[in-house]
């Protein structure tokens, strides 16, 4: 890929990270509209061209104005840049067709598993991405795309032959935007995107969010994937989830392995629930920019961890750098504490979540195999499960959650991944319920969330139980997706 030369034109391709989310007309100048598209980093260079020549020519041919986020300014949770296209409906469709063509030219090296390096975001690409279009639309436009009872999106899929999925809509919170994923063959995707552009034309508020940088966006941002959490990087993390995430970084604070993870609560006697929330938020921020936080728990002492995090901060964008610096500060505090260098204390007494952690580690629910598979992805997940259990014990001691309160959580799981949660004869699902104390129900086969091929999973129980169950299911789904992405022959 050619390096991007400085742009001398009056209207730059890359604009400052301004955040624009306001009520305004859906058109620009004389019938012009706006379309926001996600572009994988591997395709950005071919879209821009040497010295910006390709994109300049594209603007001349279509009459559109095209802006891209800066080269390292990715949409949260991805390594994809944000492209904002302004023009007539015909121009929007023409520009997107060009972008889609470049996205389909996925380099072969991008589909191969790579060695995880905490210093750089991961760049391994799901091969399915080449057949997808990802559009970011305001919440109001998303409603028009879905239609009453999902009728509109169903019609779009039937007429185009493409799959159209929207990122999940959270309960009680209105995200400014949602991400639409269109999958299929080139002509199918083109037809579906054209139908979406038509909805953009119909929505008076379709131009309410024109920012191309999300580095300074406050509050939750929509997940770029249609499955899993509605959020790309949660801004508000419940205490149980906060501690679970913080525990996953136990390698910053002590010995490697499950013993070190089990010792995590005792290693932070002076850190409050607020500290844990800050640590969790920082970890989520790094994860949202593609950094593998699991690799921080590989036996680094506090001094070594601080060095690794300093290296991350030196090469990251401002948001990720701030998160790395914060974690380095906590690692330094832990290393300077009275327990630094001491032998790890025994694991906490197994409570509800403690039992879940120990059983998960023993039975390898998240390991899903031995040998290479476990080495590639199983061990960190087992450690993370144990970390969640350790965090649960810590929260019980701190009384950060009212365990008696009942809570209902709904998450979406892709149809083709439900089997991973059910297990043979439903055994895995039963075990999840026994380990967490939560009740887990999955919608019947063929009953999907509107506009998706996702089954509804309802989790009921105490806050700690629902958080543990949600964490376990999400990690299982994430792990299974990773295995399938690296091994396309694996089915079920």
UniProtKB/Swiss-Prot annotation:
What SMART domains does this protein map onto? KH
Recorded protein name is: RNA-binding protein Nova-2
Complexes and interactors: Interacts with PTBP2; the interaction is direct.
Alphabetical UniProt keywords: Isopeptide bond, mRNA processing, mRNA splicing, Neurogenesis, Nucleus, Repeat, RNA-binding, Ubl conjugation
- How does a null allele present? Knockouts are born indistinguishable from littermates but failed to thrive, demonstrating progressive motor dysfunction and overt motor weakness, and they die an average of 14-18 days after birth. They have agenesis of the corpus callosum, and axonal outgrowth defects specific to ventral motoneuron axons and efferent innervation of the cochlea. Conditional knockouts in excitatory neurons die between three and four weeks old and show disorganized cortical and hippocampal CA1 and CA3 laminar structure.
Tell me yes or no: is Transferase among this UniProt entry's keywords: no
- Protein's job: Functions to regulate alternative splicing in neurons by binding pre-mRNA in a sequence-specific manner to activate exon inclusion or exclusion. It binds specifically to the sequences 5'-YCAY-3' and regulates splicing in only a subset of regulated exons. Binding to an exonic 5'-YCAY-3' cluster changes the protein complexes assembled on pre-mRNA, blocking U1 snRNP binding and exon inclusion, whereas binding to an intronic 5'-YCAY-3' cluster enhances spliceosome assembly and exon inclusion. With NOVA1, they perform unique biological functions in different brain areas and cell types.
**In the record, what terms sit under GO molecular function?**
mRNA binding; RNA binding; sequence-specific mRNA binding
**Gene (UniProt):** Nova2
Broad class of where this protein is predominantly found: nucleus
| This protein's domain notes | The third KH domain (KH3) recognizes specifically 5'-YCAY-3'.
Q: Look up and give the organism this protein is from.
A: Mus musculus
Q: Motif Bipartite nuclear localization signal: which residue numbers?
A: 10-26
């Amino acid at each position: 890929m050619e390096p991007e030369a400085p742009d001398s034109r009056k209207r730059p391709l890359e604009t400052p990270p301004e955040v624009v989310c306001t009520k305004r007309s859906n058109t620009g100048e004389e019938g012009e509209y706006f379309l926001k598209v996600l572009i994988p980093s591997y395709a950005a260079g071919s879209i821009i061209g040497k010295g910006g020549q390709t994109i300049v020519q594209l603007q001349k041919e279509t009459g559109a104005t095209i802006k891209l986020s800066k080269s390292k300014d990715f949409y949260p949770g991805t390594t994809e840049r944000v492209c904002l296209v302004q023009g007539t409906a015909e121009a929007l469709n023409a520009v997107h067709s060009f972008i889609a063509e470049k996205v389909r030219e996925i380099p072969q090296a991008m589909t191969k598993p790579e060695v995880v390096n905490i210093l750089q975001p991961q760049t391994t690409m799901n091969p399915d991405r080449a057949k997808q279009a990802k559009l970011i639309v305001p919440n109001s436009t998303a409603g028009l795309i879905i239609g009453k009872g999902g009728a509109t999106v169903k019609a779009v899929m039937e007429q185009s032959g493409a799959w159209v999925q929207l990122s999940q809509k959270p309960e009680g919170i209105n995200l400014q935007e949602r991400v639409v994923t269109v999958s299929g063959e080139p002509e199918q995707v083109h037809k579906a995107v054209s139908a979406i552009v038509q909805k953009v034309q119909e929505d008076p508020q379709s131009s309410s969010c024109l920012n191309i940088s999300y580095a300074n966006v406050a509050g939750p941002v929509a997940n770029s994937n249609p499955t899993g959490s509605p959020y790309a990087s949660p801004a508000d993390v419940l205490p149980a989830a906060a501690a679970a995430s913080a525990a996953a970084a136990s390698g910053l604070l002590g010995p490697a392995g499950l013993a070190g993870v089990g010792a995590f609560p005792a290693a932070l006697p002076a850190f409050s629930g607020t500290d844990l929330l800050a640590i969790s938020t920082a970890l989520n921020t790094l994860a949202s920019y593609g950094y593998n936080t699991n690799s921080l728990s590989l036996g680094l002492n506090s001094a070594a961890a601080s060095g690794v995090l300093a290296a991350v901060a030196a090469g990251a964008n401002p948001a990720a750098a701030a998160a790395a610096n914060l974690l380095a500060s906590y690692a330094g505090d832990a290393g300077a504490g009275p327990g630094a260098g001491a032998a790890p204390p025994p694991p906490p007494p197994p409570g509800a979540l403690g039992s879940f952690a120990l059983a998960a580690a023993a039975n390898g629910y998240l390991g899903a195999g031995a040998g290479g598979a476990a080495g590639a992805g199983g061990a960190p997940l087992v450690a993370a499960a144990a970390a969640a259990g350790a965090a649960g014990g810590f929260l019980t001691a701190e009384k950060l959650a009212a365990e008696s309160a009942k809570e209902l959580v709904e998450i979406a799981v892709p149809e083709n991944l439900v089997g991973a949660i059910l297990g043979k004869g439903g055994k895995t699902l039963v075990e999840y319920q026994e380990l967490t104390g939560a009740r887990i129900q999955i919608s019947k086969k063929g009953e999907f969330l509107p506009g998706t091929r996702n089954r509804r999973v309802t989790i009921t129980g105490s806050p700690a139980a629902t958080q543990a169950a949600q964490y376990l299911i999400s990690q299982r789904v994430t792990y299974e997706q990773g295995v399938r992405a690296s091994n396309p022959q694996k089915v079920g």
